[in-house]
Amino acid sequence: MNIFLDIFSFILFFGILTIISPILGKYMADIYEGRVHPSLKPIRYVEKTIYKILGIDESKEMNWKEYLYALLSFNFLGFLVLFLTLLFQKYLPLNQYHIPNMSWDLAFNTAVSFVTNTNWQAYAGETQATYFSQITGLALQNFLSAASGIVVALVLIRAFARKNTIYLGNFYVDFTRTILYVLLPVAFFSALFLVSQGVIQNFSHYKTIELLEPYKDSKNIITTQTLPMGPVASQEAIKLLGTNGGGFFNANSAHPFENPTPLSNVFEAFLIILIPASLVFTFGYMIKDKRQGWFLYSVMLFVLMLFMGIQYYFEWFGNPIVKKLGIEGPYLIGKELRFGIGGTVLFSSITTATSCGAVNSMLDSFTPLGGLVPMSLISLGEIIFGGVGSGLYGMIAMVIIAVFVAGLMIGRTPEYLNKKIESREMWSSVVITLVSGITALLLTTLALYTKWGLSSMSNPGPHGLSEVLYAYISTSNNSGSAFAGLNANTVFYNITTGLAMLIGRFIPIIAVFYMASSLSLKKHVPPSPGTLPTHTLVFGVWLVFIIIVVGALTFLPAFSLGPILEHMLMLEGVTL
């Protein structure tokens, strides 16, 4: 393991991202504006056939209420189908391992999780979900929930790009194009690459193999091991591309059947961040100001690399208690040796910044401040690239807040992208920014105040608090990753984390539509000498300041009692 090699790999990774994401962003802008390249005529034929079968008029656009109603209805139907599938999976096909039905609370939690693009997993995929549930339920929702997030971002983009109109697009058209032109093709070729790296793709029975080194437990000598099988590669690709994060196996992307090589690890991390980064450029192209796309990308990339550097430092130099025992080298507890510190930090930072939730390591085993980094990235509210779609509209809400505060300081009515920012936009932006944080803190308080919440904690002291806090920050921000020391498969946690996911997903979406309904009706205001430019270095510094301040004000007290206190105790050599 070499620090300089890791730094070089980070630079190469983000260099390639900076080259590819504008290209994909331009492609997506063309698709959503109806400019289909002649080479895509076969897909266009499929698209038209779908509209004909379903009776959809692609030329008819919707106002914000019609669009929102279609989106919410579609998501509710998806939840209902998935909930019933999990509740009765024992009786459905492709259940070679005779897996029983999920309990009602676990089925509710899992269905909500995948419909909201959170993919919080209170179950183990290899023992509690059948092949049928994985394919027709969970993998399907990986496509649908990702497309749902992207179309919400499209509505907000159009609200800025258009003027004096109530129409914001057609949900069914946007949704269909997202699936056909973006998610399916990229996921298909990504799955083929993952298979080439050793990710499995089959419908076989689980394999029983002889151990090379049998071992003895309290009762018997164990000589065999059962290896789970399944159609993993096809689900792995969309799990990452759609920033979903729910693994086929309980170990997620730390499992060698999901992520077998260092190359697959880098590729999977790239898949996670690809669409969130590209959508920023789609935004710039569709509003006819590419500078805005590059500006947002630069701010997001700066904050991500800052947090990555902090995490790398604490994980490389490790735990002083361990070093006192004469054990030198980087802190590898909870990490896969085939990835090392660099591959682990790259993956964990990207997956939490994008609110994906996939993990290639055990976050619960990181150093206190190393574990604070993913928690902090999630708690910023899905704005450092963020989930597909949700990251863009979350960042735009933060930009509007920054513009508003700057406008107050200079005594001008704030404007963003030639549109005046008034009470409706500010109200919506505040809701988008704060609702997940408030939800997480309230539910954490409830869990720590009740016996149902406390009974699931396996660790005392500040780390136990961190596990509970992380659970609700993760679910309310639709991330899905966890500090795994918490037993989340209880009625209390299944219901409360389910509510956190619903609130964190749909309240901001409603606020986005409310904002878009106002912006689309406004005319474009020509820039004046006093207009605040929102693509400059000065505004970038201001935006980063606002992002950090809002995040710190929301969670700093809770972080002080959790990971920060745990770090102080570690420096004193105290363990709990």
UniProtKB/Swiss-Prot annotation:
Pfam families: KdpA
Keyword field: Cell inner membrane, Cell membrane, Ion transport, Membrane, Potassium, Potassium transport, Transmembrane, Transmembrane helix, Transport
Cellular compartment(s): Cell inner membrane
Highest taxon of the lineage: Bacteria
UniProt keyword annotation of Cytoplasm present: no
Any one GO cellular component localisation term in the record: plasma membrane
Transmembrane residue ranges: 3-23, 68-88, 137-157, 179-199, 267-287, 294-314, 339-359, 369-389, 391-411, 430-450, 495-515, 537-557
Annotated membrane topology: Multi-pass membrane protein
Keyword Cell inner membrane: yes
A GO term, aspect molecular function: P-type potassium transmembrane transporter activity
Function: Part of the high-affinity ATP-driven potassium transport (or Kdp) system, which catalyzes the hydrolysis of ATP coupled with the electrogenic transport of potassium into the cytoplasm. This subunit binds the periplasmic potassium ions and delivers the ions to the membrane domain of KdpB through an intramembrane tunnel.
Subunit and interaction comment: The system is composed of three essential subunits: KdpA, KdpB and KdpC.
PANTHER family: POTASSIUM-TRANSPORTING ATPASE A CHAIN (PTHR30607), POTASSIUM-TRANSPORTING ATPASE POTASSIUM-BINDING SUBUNIT (PTHR30607:SF2)
Protein family membership: Belongs to the KdpA family.
Entry protein name: Potassium-transporting ATPase potassium-binding subunit
Naturally occurring in which organism (per UniProt): Hydrogenobaculum sp. (strain Y04AAS1)
Lineage, highest ranks first: Bacteria, Pseudomonadati, Aquificota, Aquificia, Aquificales
Gene that encodes it: kdpA
